Amino acid sequence: MAIKRCPASIDVVEAAKIRIRNVFRNGLPVYMSFSGGKDSLCMSQLVMNLIQTGEIDPAQLIVQFIDEEAIFPCMEEKVREWRKKFILVGAKFEWFCLEVKHYNCFNELSNDETFICWDRYKKDVWVRQPPSFAIRDHPLLRPRIDAYQDFLPRLCTAGITITGIRTAESVQRLQNIAVMLRAGKSMTNKHQVFPIYDWTNNDVWLYLLREKVDIPEIYLFLWQSGTKKGQLRVSQFFSIDTAKSLVKMNEYYPDLMERIIRREPNAYLAALYWDSEMFGRNT
């Protein structure tokens, strides 16, 4: 599919602000997906600035964080900081620690590509403990059956969801959003808006720098270990993007690999084959 890019008369930051203001003007609850990663930090700073200038109502805002258990310590720390910020300005922050299915690249060989976050039958080997204030269950959730992508849409039907998805992340995302934009008004049937969809990687890092937003230190560690700027992605440990960097991060988090292997025995594959075709490298 051919995709035509149209230049705008305003910069991407101002465009994102306009989109966010328009969402809040509907008067509906606004659900914001939050991960603690660079894109969601940009979204959060944009929203926080608009709250502080009185341009949007924080009482409409419900921030949602799906805690996938296997996350870096600095990511949890950053999410805690932002949880406090949002609560202090009058927004609601939902921190979910749920038994949801997640993709597990280490289980490809056994034909089982799922991982159950916060598995009740594996409490003794959880990578970390959930916060005391976390939401551990929900009537709309089908535990151990749903992925969070199944659960959240059911939870957010009463409002509009804003998410920090960007077309620069992948060709697939570019094509998907192009199709949605071409659909015109029908795209709103999904109740989703992507305020920073047109931001480049440079836009993201420049905005975080100019706004003096603290980022999780894992990004600095990845950069120091030789990861290219366009590949600075952080997700749950058993996703392909993060799995291939686990061995490098063992230098910065000495006990982390041990805890990961205890939770997911096949994770030893990362130590043996991280620089091979298994993790996207052709050597």
Q: For the regions a protein language model found, what residue spans apply to each?
A:
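Nucleotide-activated chemistry modules centered on ATP-dependent adenylation/adenylyltransferase
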Residues: 1-31, 38-283
